[in-house]
Swiss-Prot record:
The modification O-(pantetheine 4'-phosphoryl)serine is found at S39. Residues 4-79 form the Carrier domain. Its main location: cytoplasm. 4'-phosphopantetheine is transferred from CoA to a specific serine of apo-ACP by AcpS. This modification is essential for activity because fatty acids are bound in thioester linkage to the sulfhydryl of the prosthetic group. GO terms for biological process: lipid A biosynthetic process. This is Acyl carrier protein. PROSITE patterns: CARRIER (PS50075), PHOSPHOPANTETHEINE (PS00012). It is found in: Cytoplasm. It holds the Pfam family PP-binding. GO terms for molecular function: acyl binding; acyl carrier activity; phosphopantetheine binding. Carrier of the growing fatty acid chain in fatty acid biosynthesis. Pathway: Lipid metabolism; fatty acid biosynthesis.
Amino acid sequence: MSQEAILEKVRSIVAEQLSVEAGEVKPDSNFQNDLGADSLDTVELVMALEEAFDIEIPDEAAEGIATVGDAVKYIEEKQS
């Protein structure tokens, strides 16, 4: 899956999970600071990404995923 395809899928999931417009979800968008996620939203978002991409994101790795771009990069690495 290309980086662009991953970004589009992540953007769609983030928009749905956080009830924001997909246009607001940019690679440098911080889940908490820019998109209004709280800690529970972040946990639910990680679970949705795990399911959508059929990967496992350990807690230690999840703590390092603060932006949409971080999520895309992590998923890209897991799929290569």
